[in-house]
Amino acid sequence: YNGAIGVDNAGKPVATMGELAKARGMKIGNVSTAEIQDATPAAFAAHALDRSYYAPSGDKKVAKGDQLRENGGLGSISEQIVDLRADVTLGGGSKYFDTEVVQGGKWNASGNTWTAGKSVLDNAKDNGYQVVTNASELEAIAEANSDKPVLGLFSEGNMPRVLNQSIPTTDGGDQQPATCVANPEFTEETPRLGAMTSKALELLQNDNGFLLQVESASPDKADHQADACGLIGEVGQLDEAVQAVQKWVEETGEETLIVATADHPHTAQITYDNANTAGRVTQLTTVDGSTMAVNFATSKTNEDEDALGGQQHTGAQLRVAASGPGAANVTGQIVQTD
C-alpha cells in the first residue's frame, strides 16, 4: 500500500531485493545520495508500515506502534539496515543512526546483538561495521563482507547537491539569466555518486556475483523545490554513476546486467526564454552562452526562497534501459504513477 516499505496490504513483510540476493550467496550494496533510510534504499533493505519510520527514538521520523521492537516489531529502518548487514551501504542520514536503541537483544539471523541505551551507530560498530564519514575514509577501505560490512554516512540528512540552489520566479521574463555555480557545502571530502559507485563495485566483486542498488536521489528533491541548477547537477551525478558501472564492466569483462530506471516520474520543462508560463521559471545561461528557461508547473507555492517546495511528481511513463545478459527481457517503458 502507498507509503509502506517492504510489506503487503496486510502489513506483513515481503522479501526485499537485498534479502533475496543475500539468500543466494551474493554480495549486496546499497548506495544513495539521499538519507539511506529514504524510500528507494529502504526498499532494498527494510520492512516498514510507514516509510517515515527512520529511527527507534528521538523527535523526528520515529517508528511507532507495531513497528517498534519493544512492541514485537522489526524495528526502525535504521535498525533493519544494520541487521541486513549489506556488504556496502553508503549515503546520508547519520542523524537517525545517532538515536538511541530502546530494545536490546537479537532480532534476526544476522548475528547482531543490540544493546539498549546505545545509539544505532554505536551498535553497528559493536557488531563489526566499518564506519566511514568522508571520501578519504571511504577510499581507504580495502575489503567489505558480511563480517566487516561498510557503512558510509556522509551527511546528517540528504547529501548536499553538487550545484548551488537556483531560485525561480513567477515570470521567467523578469529574471536575468543565472549561471549554475558549485555548492560550497559539497566539499572535496563529499564523495560523488560516481566515486561511491566505483568503490562499491570494487568491494563487491566476488565469484558468487553481487547486486548493487545505486540512486541519484536529488533530481527528485531538486524538482520538489523548483531548483533547476540542483536538478542539473544531480542528473550529472546519475550520468557519472552509469559511466562508472559501464567502465567497470568493460575493464573486468564480467557478465553484468545493468538496469537504469526511476521509481516515479518527476519532470520539469525546458521552454523558450522570456516565456510566460503558469509555473515557476528559472532562466539559465548555458555553456554555449545561450539562455535556457526551465519551468516547474505542478505547484505555484514557490513565491520566494523561504517558501520553496511543493512541486509534485508528474504522470509520465518511465524509461527502463538495460545492457548485458538478460537485457532483452527488460521492458522499454513502464507506467509508474503515484
Over which residues does each language-model region extend?
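A post-motif C-terminal structural segment
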Residues: Q37-D338
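Mobile, glycine-rich extracellular loop/lid and propeptide segments
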Residues: Y1-R51, D59-K60, A217, T267
